[in-house]
Amino acid sequence: MPTPTKGARLGGSPAHERLLLANLATALFEHGGITTTEAKAKRLRPYAERLVTFAKRGDLHARRRVMRHVRDNSVVHTLFTEIGPRYANRDGGYTRIIKLGNRKGDNAPLARIELVEALTVGQQAVGEAERARGTRFSERRKPTGATAEAAEDLASESPTAAAVAAQSAEEQAPVEETLTAQAAETSAATVEETDDDGPAESKS
């Protein structure tokens, strides 16, 4: 038995809700973005992203699973030939929801749900370089030797990744100089305290 969804049901019956989500997903894949109520957009988001995941697989079984929900053959073709390959390097997060305010008349909150853009070559190179140098991506996935080598190759090929690597080196250099200066000051202060204590003990 399927787990019931919390909150009010869209439409009136379960069958009406399934048809409503299928039609909204078809319109989303056909036009790239639609404007609807905020409640429908939030319910549509996981529904549509699951269909995009099937499209990324690209096999016959995945196509048949999608055609259970999307009945328009042209939209299914677009989903498997254009939308699915677009997100080959993105693990989830294929849509975004933008709130638009309330609608005149019934004051219902409106929102626009749309497909996000694909990752560019520069963004992929920057992501690989950041994983290799162990910054904000290191908590999620630590780079292997192959990933580090690939990031270095991408940095040599991509000017964006090279700029990121240069900026990282510039940020690390002042930190090392500051630590060296602090260590020198600490040692000098220790020597002065020793010199001050020495004569006092000899007088006593």
Swiss-Prot record:
The organism's place on the tree of life at top rank: Bacteria
Keywords: Ribonucleoprotein, Ribosomal protein
GO molecular function, one term: structural constituent of ribosome
Biased composition (Acidic residues): 192-204
Stored PROSITE patterns: RIBOSOMAL_L17
Any one of the GO CC terms: cytosolic large ribosomal subunit
Annotated Gene3D superfamilies: Ribosomal protein L17
Biased amino acid composition, Low complexity: 156-191
Basic and acidic residues bias spans: 128-142
The keyword Ribosomal protein appears for this protein: yes
InterPro entries: Ribosomal_bL17, Ribosomal_bL17_CS, Ribosomal_bL17_sf
Region called Disordered, residue ranges: 124-204
A GO biological process held by the record: translation
Family matches, as PANTHER family: LARGE RIBOSOMAL SUBUNIT PROTEIN BL17M, RIBOSOMAL PROTEIN L17
Quaternary structure annotation from Swiss-Prot or TrEMBL: Part of the 50S ribosomal subunit. Contacts protein L32.
Entry similarity comment: Belongs to the bacterial ribosomal protein bL17 family.
Name of the protein described by the UniProt record: Large ribosomal subunit protein bL17
